[in-house]
Amino acid sequence: MVRVLSATKLRQEIEPQWVSWYIKEYYPDAEVRMRCPLGPIPDELKQLYGPAKAARVYRPSRPEIDALVILPGALLLIEAKVIRYMDGLAKLPVYAALVPLTPELLVFKKLPILMHLLLPVRIPWVIAAAPALGVEVMTAAPDWVLKKWEDRDKSWTAEARMRRAERKALLKQLGFV
């Protein structure tokens, strides 16, 4: 599990591991590109650096899909969301629009694009809205992801609020806030 340290908190990025688990379970033999950058690269950069280096230079500015699975006859875009479901619903159609403009994916330009939003549990409003966007909602998660999902509601208990207040006071005392 990737842990990102900032001045005030330790954040866990669980979605990349979860997507890897999902692909291993459901698409074990498929070609997969994790955190695949999408979209065009500016012509100015291609002229200045050449196409390969321009792609590397511009990568931080390009959006990334959690996973792109190359299936026989289709491309599958997978975006996983533990909590921010609206972000996943909104991003997937944009990502699909960027695939034909992505130089690294031009060979797949004519393939149909499927979009899967991976959720830990069924969320009724997401399932209701997804078909209008061409998104299929998939609910699959290992136990450790379900635990994270269940723990999210506990962050607003009196006990959790008290722990946050104590932590904030300590950070302030140490000069971080």
Segments (PLM) and residue ranges:
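Charged, terminal alpha-helix-loop-beta segments
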Residues: M1-V177
